[in-house]
């Protein structure tokens, strides 16, 4: 098999390479006191979550997809580059919170760790109790006053949702700014990987300013050159606008649709209510089909032009098709809301007309199958406690172009 060219220009081109993160020690940091702050709706059974994720990864491999695990990429980058170690430590150690004396001691300790151990700390965090025994307590008021179980480095339990912290658009990768404090440092790890891992040598960036929040779950590649960006709880209007201008400047898109969505937990990203399942077909939460609008942003000779229309109409026009087909799940309103909450609309396309979905959303899956979509199901009773489905848990690095 030859070297796969990295890049994606659609949601449904045959998936060749994907980044996943097998949940690990970072989930063990969740407890009843911090679960809300760390953006989970419950305490997952970690061993079962790992089993479910292994099933997901194996399904992708069985379909010819190369699965890259984020923890492996991080360890390899830290092994390959001393600069990567410096970058990772600098992003993890916050002198403003820890004070200069403790920050200096902690940084020196982390830089001396073996790559695999450092990678683990960068992902799972560290408590004050886990500091080395010879850490000087006499010079740090912060160390003396903190409870031993407090985090000196916060864990990153949402790493499993690799979709959000890097976005491939064409041959370039976007390392976005994540909106919430619990997730901000995730992007520092993907930034490190793309900067220092040999697999990504020469990969160019898009949206390099990263000044306003954009998250990958809000970004849908509707067709080559056409990008939809959800604007709601996570991605801001300023982020959508800045991303659009960056994509225009780099000739990565000719049209960007900014799609307002409700600012609520159940609809945190655009891909929680709408994903593509074929080149001209979406599955969409029934309660938003008629309500979604879009601001079409296009580059013109005189600058940038913005117009507003219903989302489905704007999308079809931008894609150059008569109509964007919406699979009617036809569900009872209560069942529709239940299955949307359980990520029933958050499917991952492996190729046109073939998707991965959580098995628990039986009614949505049945309607997809009746519409001619092949649905490959995985368990998600524990993975779903962080409110994310197969699309959320995957970052496509290479798809066949459409």
UniProtKB/Swiss-Prot annotation:
Belongs to the arginine deiminase family. InterPro entries: Arg_deiminase (IPR003876). GO terms for cellular component: cytoplasm. This is Arginine deiminase. Pfam families: ADI. Its main location: cytoplasm. The gene is arcA. It comes from Mycobacterium avium (strain 104). One of its GO terms (molecular function) is arginine deiminase activity. Its EC number is 3.5.3.6. The active site is at residue 392. It is found in: Cytoplasm. The lineage of its organism: Bacteria, Bacillati, Actinomycetota, Actinomycetes, Mycobacteriales. GO terms for biological process: arginine catabolic process to ornithine; arginine deiminase pathway. PANTHER family: ARGININE DEIMINASE. It is an enzyme of class 3 (hydrolase). Keywords: Arginine metabolism, Cytoplasm, Hydrolase. It comes from the Bacteria. Pathway: Amino-acid degradation; L-arginine degradation via ADI pathway; carbamoyl phosphate from L-arginine: step 1/2. It catalyses: L-arginine + H2O = L-citrulline + NH4(+).
């Amino acid at each position: 098999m030859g070297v796969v060219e990295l890049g994606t220009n659609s949601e449904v081109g045959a998936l060749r390479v994907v980044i996943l993160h097998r949940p690990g020690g970072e989930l063990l940091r969740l407890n009843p006191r911090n679960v809300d702050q760390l953006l989970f709706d419950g305490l997952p059974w970690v061993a079962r979550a790992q089993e479910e994720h292994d099933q997901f990864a194996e399904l992708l491999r069985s379909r010819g997809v190369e699965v890259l695990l984020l923890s492996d990429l991080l360890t390899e980058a830290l092994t390959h580059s001393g600069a990567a170690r410096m970058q990772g430590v600098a992003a993890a150690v916050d002198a403003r919170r820890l004070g200069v004396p403790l920050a200096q001691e902690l940084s020196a300790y982390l830089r001396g760790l073996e790559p695999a151990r450092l990678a683990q700390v960068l992902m799972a965090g560290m408590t004050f109790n886990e500091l080395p025994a010879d850490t000087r307590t006499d010079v740090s008021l912060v160390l003396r006053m903190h409870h031993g179980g407090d985090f000196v480095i916060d864990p990153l339990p949402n790493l499993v949702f690799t979709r959000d912290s890097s976005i491939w658009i064409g041959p370039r990768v976007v390392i976005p700014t994540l909106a919430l404090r619990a997730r901000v440092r995730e992007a520092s790890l993907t930034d490190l990987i793309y900067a220092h891992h040999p697999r990504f040598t020469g990969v160019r960036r898009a949206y390099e300013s990263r000044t306003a929040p954009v998250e990958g779950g809000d970004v849908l590649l509707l067709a080559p050159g056409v990008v939809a960006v959800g604007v709601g709880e996570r991605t801001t209007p300023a982020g959508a606008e800045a991303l659009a201008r960056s994509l225009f400047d780099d000739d990565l898109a000719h049209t960007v649709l900014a799609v307002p969505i409700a600012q609520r937990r159940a609809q945190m990203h655009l891909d929680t209510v709408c994903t593509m399942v074929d080149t001209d077909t979406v599955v969409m939460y029934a309660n938003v089909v008629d309500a979604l609008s879009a601001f079409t942003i296009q580059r013109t000779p005189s600058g940038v032009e913005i117009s507003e229309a219903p989302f489905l109409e704007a999308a079809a026009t931008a894609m150059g098709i008569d109509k964007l087909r919406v699979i009617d799940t036809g569900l009872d309103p209560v069942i529709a809301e239940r299955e949307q909450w359980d990520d029933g609309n958050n499917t991952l396309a492996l190729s046109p007309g073939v998707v991965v979905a959580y098995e628990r959303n039986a009614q949505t899956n049945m309607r997809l199958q009746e519409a001619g979509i092949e649905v490959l199901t995985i368990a998600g009773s524990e993975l779903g406690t962080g409110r994310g489905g197969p699309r959320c848990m995957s970052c496509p690095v290479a798809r066949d172009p459409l």
